[in-house]
Amino acid sequence: MNSEKKHKKKSKMERGLTNRHVQVMAIAGTIGTGLFLGAGRSISLTGPSIVLVYMITGGFMYLMMRAIGEMLYQDPEQHTFINFITRYLGKGWGYFSVWSYWLSVVFIGMAEITAIAHYVQFWFPSWPSWLIQVVFLTILGLVNLIAVKIFGEVEFWFAMIKIVAILAMIATGIFMVLTGFETPYGSASLTNISEQFSLFPNGGMNFVMAFQMVFFAYLMIEFIGVTTSETKDPRKVLPKAVKEIPLRIIFFYGGALLAIMSIIPWRELSATDSPFVTVFELVGLKWAAALINFVVLTSAASALNSTLYSTGRHLYQIAHDSPNRFLKSIKADTLSRHNVPQNAIIASAALIGLAAFINVLPGVSDAFALITASSSGVYIAIYILIMVAHLKYRKSKDFMADGYLMPQYRLLNPLTMLFFIFVFGTLFLQESTVMGARGSAIWIVAFGIYSQWKFRK
């Protein structure tokens, strides 16, 4: 018993991630699976101006990362940015945030494992969804349990697949435009974008609705900051990983979307089919659908892998800061001999596995949209709280004047919060997301009040 207590106190999570791991994960971390599958749907909403939606949303996510990065740079020992909410806003908001964030990431994990089963059934339609989910959860769970170095290596190669796929799309677009490649839709040309351009071709409301779709593509971008804490030199790795986010967004999202719309006039794009598949089939790649399915499968597996990493560390933090009988019974506050939060990862994986039951709930026709909306709403509340915590940090004795500072924070911090509130409002505009939005709103109010009451007793 004494040796176990000693182990709890002295053990620290392994700093096994290298700069190579973090930089590639940082690139891939800004690229959501939605780009490969949902680009057609988002383009159909608002045409070429979808690029503007991606740039605006990406810009505000970058500003949030600058706020998180500034605080992590000052205290690189933190393994979760939620600790800054506790430190600067109090235990009540910290309790609300750490549980809400953990649950919202679990919801995202449920969406990811649901998607993985769908992608595998592309090749094996007779395989039951629950079996696919169990197999992937087990494999990726083991990856997270062995050592953080193994997690980093697996994520590195998952990330490379996404990056290569987008580079191939951009290169294909450049080649087809330069050669005037003829397709059934006409010649590949930039005029497919510029001709009869309108900022709101389908009305202002569709432009507004595109923001919540794009926002979900960026969720968990803060994972970039979390991973840097498990590198040997976080103060060197963190600024480089964060400051390159805008260029990555412009190049990968902007480049891919412009390439797609240059090849195929946007009004001809299917809202349901992947434009990546369509483009690669145009250049004669008969197995394009299988190729893109493989890319999105590895992308979803990468996201689930990161989710297990994140939820395990956040539950470990909860077990330390706000222990309860259940967390004590599963020893969620202990590390394995590999210095990873083994029990916390297993508990998180078990909860994510409940996705199979959610998918058959009566009355829920679109489980993925329900989970997406719920997690997005709760996520927005956490993002707003971290921005408030950043304002408090700037006025605290912890402020590091020569640190990695967020630029023009007095203006850009409040603007970022207003943008997040705007995105939350868009969740109520679509039938498939309004149920989840209402649920997240009820959670934010009810659990927020309870959390404040709990620490004022």
Model feature map: region roles:
Residues 117, 130-188, 215-219, 242-247, ...:
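Membrane-interface loop-to-helix entry segments
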Residues 8-13, 51, 125-128, 160-293, ...:
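Helix-loop-helix junctions that connect adjacent transmembrane segments
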Residues 1-40, 44-49, 61-66, 77-78, ...:
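Membrane-interface "cap" regions at the ends of multi-pass membrane proteins
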Residues 14, 37-132, 136, 245-250, ...:
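Extracellular loop-to-transmembrane helix junctions
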Residues 77, 100-114, 218, 222-231, ...:
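Membrane-helix boundary/coupling elements in multi-pass transport proteins
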Residues 158, 330-340, 380-431:
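C-terminal membrane-solvent junction of multi-pass transporters and transport-like membrane proteins
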